[in-house]
């Protein structure tokens, strides 16, 4: 199991620090996403860091790699 989460997720319900805490508590690897562009709309919707806007392809490739191999090749996606 893995958690993919944006470091700067603006949604008040899904702060990165909480994902990091849960990752540690549950022993699940955390993959931190950074950066992106074109953010717009409500903080908890898909077109902000919450939805990995501007990083969709990199996140999708990392998830594809995870599905194909059962592992992630890095802890951060920039």
Residue ranges and their predicted role:
Residues 2-5:
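Short beta-strand/loop motif that positions the catalytic acidic residue
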Residues 8-30:
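Short alpha-helix in the alpha/beta-hydrolase fold that links the catalytic acid
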Residues 7-11, 36-39:
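Solvent-exposed loop/turn segments at secondary-structure junctions
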